Amino acid sequence: MAAPIRAFVLRVLSDSTRNIHHVLRCRSKYLCRRAAITARRGYSDSTEGRSTHFGFQTVPEEEKAEKVYKVFESVAKKYDVMNDAMSLGIHRLWKDTLLHIMNPQPGLRLLDTAGGTGDISFRFLEYTRSMYDRQQRLRAKSQQTPSWKDIAGHYVSDEEGPPQSRAVVCDINKEMLKVGKQRAEDAGITTGLSWVAGDAEELPFDDDQFDMYTIAFGIRNVTHIEQALQEAFRVLKPGGRFMCLEFSKVTNPLLARLYDAYSFQMIPVLGEVIAGDWKSYQYLVESIRKFPDQEIFKEMIEDAGFFRVQYFNLTGGIVAIHSGFKL
């Protein structure tokens, strides 16, 4: 009797030792990745005198948020026009691709962080509305000779109305929100949409509130990317999905050279001609080059707690869509 008990105890101790070693290895890998990410971001992890990048400049951390705010305050009224001019309209296809990968179902709640002028939220509401209409058409086709029970159920569902999808646009910049609200009014979007002034690093929402979280062309402007990712994880419901559309590292060397030439020589000029603001668009170009590449950003998302993290390169890696789930 003693021998089996002794064998059982030894096995438990052995398993516990292996688990401890596994945790220590994971922790070591995490710290190594964090050190690499910190170095890439260009600021110290010490608590005093921390600095970060603002484009190619090195600035104190507390100054970056203010500088970024002023950039978007300056470009807000011409932001959408400049997006079309800079990308030759391709940004619309990138955003449509984000929605198709996301494939949101009717009735879900979206947090569109750094949502600015509402592009992603408008697409989300239109997509879920179209999805609901398609589901209704398929349902009607499958009921060519409905029973009285089906007819009664149809009347009940009509009274209840379609499931209401909701999008919350959260942006730290009030000028961007003002432009977005005007766009929504002009487009006749009156339901399912709300606007909140808030910081991606300290979201003004309770835990487990949203089914989906998107941030499009915004996370590279955040001072502490890890903190923004942790906030995304916090406000998502279990099973919720994180999606980020952001400029990334071009994978083709020839395209990379052409892209660099276009970015640095043409985009600031367009900014001056269209928006009367060279410096803001010079910063935007530089901020793209300072953002982590696809693999490093994927690791950052995993470190925030997300699972099944993957990314999709678009237009040769000029932009990438990262996706992850909160389990």
Curated annotation (Swiss-Prot):
One annotated GO molecular function is: 2-methoxy-6-polyprenyl-1,4-benzoquinol methyltransferase activity
Q: Where does S-adenosyl-L-methionine bind?
A: T117, D171, D199, A200
Question: Which pathway does it serve?
Answer: Cofactor biosynthesis; ubiquinone biosynthesis
Annotated GO biological processes are:
methylation; ubiquinone biosynthetic process
What InterPro entries does the entry give? SAM-dependent_MTases_sf, UbiE/COQ5_MeTrFase, UbiE/COQ5_MeTrFase_CS
Keywords (A to Z) from UniProt:
Membrane, Methyltransferase, Mitochondrion, Mitochondrion inner membrane, S-adenosyl-L-methionine, Transferase, Transit peptide, Ubiquinone biosynthesis
In Pfam terms, one family for this protein is Ubie_methyltran
**Superkingdom per UniProt:** Eukaryota
Q: How does it sit in the membrane?
A: Peripheral membrane protein
Q: What class of enzyme is it?
A: transferase
Q: What does this protein do?
A: Methyltransferase required for the conversion of 2-polyprenyl-6-methoxy-1,4-benzoquinol (DDMQH2) to 2-polyprenyl-3-methyl-6-methoxy-1,4-benzoquinol (DMQH2).
Q: Which HAMAP family match?
A: MenG_UbiE_methyltr
Recorded protein name is 2-methoxy-6-polyprenyl-1,4-benzoquinol methylase, mitochondrial
User: What organism does the record attribute this protein to?
Assistant: Danio rerio (Zebrafish)
